[in-house]
Amino acid sequence: MKSRKSGFTLVELLTVLVIIALMMGVLLPALNLVRNTAKKAKQEVQFATIEQAIMAFKGDYGDYPPSNNLYGDYEGAQQLAEALVGWDLMGFDTDSAWRSNGCLDAAGINWIYPPQPLDLTDPVVKKNLEDRKGPYLELSKANVFRLGNTVNGPGLFNNTGALNPDRYVLCDSFGAKNLILKNGTKTETVIAGTPILYYKANTSSKQWGPPGSVNKRIYFDGDNRALVSLGRMTDGKPHPLGGITDPFPSMGFPANFYYYLIDQKMVPIMGQYGWPVNADSYVLISAGADGLYGTADDITNF
């Protein structure tokens, strides 16, 4: 009588592999859902922390941080970072002119924030630092990164267009890009999220829908238009928030931004264009897990 050989047959092995593949097909989406839910919760906590920091800033400064692009190279996301951690990450100077060069003038002659590297033996520099406010966020937990790659260090984008690449932004909790930070002979890899968009409401305006100039409305897309136009951080894919496919194209370019901020509860009162959310304060927008502004997974403060 022949002895039976031990082991699995090919059919049995294939069956096991099919079962494993099916289980992975079920488990992986579930794991991704759990992971994204955890990141969403973390992002909501970050927004709560930022909102507390903004209120502390307002208490010192008398107003919310601005979100304009008066000089073409410095927008709302960057101005929020200056307000909460400082132009040079060393706290906010209440004399700020909100320029990307940290000076009173475009030529960079009359500085508000001292030139870098900071000379701590200079009494003028020491006094400047002593008079600063904040930082209002703990720097190690602020998720703050340089906007672009420069000789001064790595950043989120290789090309920042018209925006000053050396200025900082606060990033969300959805890791999108690895950055290698160097400190002497040591290197550290950190995961940076997508920049958090910040828009301050124009509380003196009572204009939202057409007619009228878009930059006179309660919120103005131009406050972060250059940053949004860079596309998704990982591949440059256009952000839906910057599009014009909205049902109300007459609201002005980009119409999607204005539709995105409509408080639907106000439509029966104000008509089809409604009224914006947070009309007396500000808006924060995280691109969410997909890294795109203007999609269903965005996290906002409204």
Residue ranges and their predicted role:
Residues 4-34, 43, 47:
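N-terminal single-pass transmembrane signal-anchor helix
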Residues 15, 35-39, 72, 272:
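Conserved aromatic-histidine-acidic binding/catalytic patches
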Residues 31-34, 38, 54:
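Hydrophobic helical segment of the DHp/HisKA dimerization and phosphotransfer domain
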Residues 44-302:
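N-terminal pilin/flagellin-like segments and related low-complexity appendage regions
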